[in-house]
From Swiss-Prot:
Major subcellular site: cytoplasm
Pfam families (alphabetical): NAD_Gly3P_dh_C, NAD_Gly3P_dh_N
One term under GO cellular component: cytosol
Binding residues annotated for sn-glycerol 3-phosphate, in chain numbering: K106, G137, S139, K192, D245, S255, R256, N257
Catalytic activity field: sn-glycerol 3-phosphate + NAD(+) = dihydroxyacetone phosphate + NADH + H(+); sn-glycerol 3-phosphate + NADP(+) = dihydroxyacetone phosphate + NADPH + H(+)
Family of this protein: Belongs to the NAD-dependent glycerol-3-phosphate dehydrogenase family.
Cited InterPro entries: 6-PGluconate_DH-like_C_sf, 6PGD_dom2, G3P_DH_NAD-dep, G3P_DH_NAD-dep_C, G3P_DH_NAD-dep_N, NAD(P)-bd_dom_sf
Gene: gpsA
Keywords: Cytoplasm, Lipid biosynthesis, Lipid metabolism, NAD, NADP, Nucleotide-binding, Oxidoreductase, Phospholipid biosynthesis, Phospholipid metabolism
Compartment(s) where it occurs, according to its Swiss-Prot or TrEMBL record: Cytoplasm
Lineage: Bacteria, Pseudomonadati, Chlamydiota, Chlamydiia, Chlamydiales
Enzyme class (EC, first level): oxidoreductase
Protein name: Glycerol-3-phosphate dehydrogenase [NAD(P)+]
Domain of life: Bacteria
Organism of origin: Chlamydia caviae (strain ATCC VR-813 / DSM 19441 / 03DC25 / GPIC) (Chlamydophila caviae)
Length: 334
C-alpha cells in the first residue's frame, strides 16, 4: 500500500509539488476549497494553469479536508499566505499535528506580522513546532513540472522531521538541501517578493540590467538587515532561500511579482494589475507587513519603503524612483 501524503491547496505550485510527490510513488490527495477547480481536475485530468501536463495516476483530489488528511503520513500546505490561518484553523477541528507539516507558501501575515510557521504554532500550540517544516528556494513551478533541475532548501526544528521531509521531496532533478534556520528560510522567501516588484517596475521603465542588478544587490542587503534584527542567520540569506530565490523571482519572465511591478509601471492600478495576473501576488501583501515591522524596529529599508508607499499611499512611481536615486551614498556594507 502506497504511503499517503495530503496536499492542502491546488494552485499551480501546490499542483507542481503534489505531482512531484506522486511521481515518487506516494499516494497524494490534493485538497482545495474551490469545488469547481476540484471537479475540473477530477474530470479533465488537467490543471487549468498547466493544461499540457497530465495528472499522475497517484494524485487524486477532494474538497473534503478530513478525507485528504485521514491516515496521511505527511501534510503539505500550498495555499496563499492569507489562507494559511483559515486552513490551519479548519485542520485543527479535524486533527492535531502529529505528522510532518510542510509549509511551502511565502509571506508574512498582514496586521500581525507573524511568519506562516508562527501562525501554525499559534493555532496548534508549541508542541506543533516539532512537526513543522519549511520548503523554499528558487523554484518556478512550470520548470519543476518539466523536470528541469532545481535546488531548494528544507528547514525544520526537529532533525527527524527534517529527514522525513528531505527524503520525501528529494529527486535526481529536485535537489533538497537541509537548513536549520527555519525563520531565515521563511523570511528570505517572503521578502524577495517585494524586491521583485521593484525589479518589475524597473523593467516597465526599461531601465536596463544595470539598474536591475543594483536593485537585487541592495534588496538582498535590506533582506539581510531585516533578518538579522529578527534573529536569523545572515548566511541563510546568502543561500538558496535568500539570494537564490531573489535572483529567480527578479529575473524570471514567469515571476508574477515581477510581472505585477511591470504592469503598474506601465500605468495600471494595483487592482488592475492583480486582475491581469489572475493569481495571488504575495509581494503586495508582504510589503505592508514588512514595512510595519521595519518601522517598528527602525530598520532602514528604502526599497521596501518605496514599494509600500507606491502600493498603499499612492506615491507616484516616478517620485519614488527619484527618492531612491537621491539618497545620500555611504560605505557599501553587505
Amino acid at each position: 500500500m502506497k504511503e499517503k501524503i495530503a496536499y492542502l491547496g491546488m494552485g499551480i505550485w501546490g499542483f507542481c509539488l503534489a505531482s512531484l510527490l506522486a511521481n515518487k510513488g506516494y499516494h497524494v490527495v490534493g485538497w482545495a476549497r474551490n469545488a469547481e477547480l476540484i471537479a475540473q481536475l477530477q474530470t479533465e485530468k488537467r490543471h487549468p494553469q498547466v493544461p499540457d501536463v497530465p495528472i499522475h495516476p497517484n494524485l487524486s483530489f477532494t474538497t473534503d479536508m478530513a478525507e485528504a488528511v485521514e491516515n496521511a503520513s505527511m501534510i503539505v500546505e500550498g495555499v496563499s499566505s492569507a489562507g494559511i490561518r483559515p486552513v490551519s484553523e479548519q485542520l485543527k477541528t479535524i486533527t492535531n499535528l502529529n505528522v510532518p507539516f510542510v509549509i511551502t507558501s511565502k509571506g508574512i501575515e498582514q496586521h500581525t506580522g507573524l511568519l506562516l510557521s508562527e501562525i501554525v504554532v499559534e493555532i496548534f500550540g508549541n508542541d506543533a513546532s516539532q512537526y513543522l517544516g519549511y520548503l523554499s528556494g528558487p523554484s518556478i513551478a512550470r520548470e519543476v513540472l518539466k523536470g528541469c533541475p532545481c535546488s531548494v532548501v528544507i528547514s525544520a526544528y526537529n532533525p527527524d522531521t527534517l529527514k522525513k521531509i528531505h527524503n520525501a521531496f528529494l529527486t535526481p532533478t529536485f535537489r533538497v538541501y537541509p537548513n536549520s534556520d527555519l525563520k531565515g528560510v521563511a523570511l528570505g522567501g517572503a521578502l524577495k517578493n517585494i524586491i521583485a516588484i521593484a525589479c518589475g517596475i524597473s523593467d516597465g521603465f526599461r531601465f536596463g540590467d544595470n539598474a536591475k542588478s543594483g536593485l537585487v544587490t541592495r534588496g538582498l542587503h535590506e533582506i539581510r538587515k531585516f533578518a538579522t534584527i529578527m534573529n536569523c542567520r545572515p548566511d541563510t540569506l546568502n543561500g538558496l532561500a535568500g539570494l537564490g530565490d531573489l535572483c529567480t523571482t527578479c529575473f524570471s519572465s514567469l515571476s508574477r511579482n515581477t510581472k505585477f511591478g511591470k504592469l503598474i509601471a506601465q500605468g495600471m492600478t494595483v487592482a488592475q494589475a492583480k486582475a491581469e495576473i489572475g493569481m495571488v501576488v504575495e509581494g503586495v501583501y508582504t510589503a505592508l507587513s514588512a514595512y510595519q515591522i521595519a518601522k517598528h524596529h527602525k530598520i532602514d529599508m528604502p526599497i521596501t519603503t518605496g514599494i509600500y508607499r507606491v502600493l498603499y499611499e499612492n506615491l507616484d512611481i516616478q517620485e519614488g524612483i527619484a527618492a531612491l536615486l537621491q539618497r545620500n551614498t555611504k560605505e557599501e556594507y553587505l
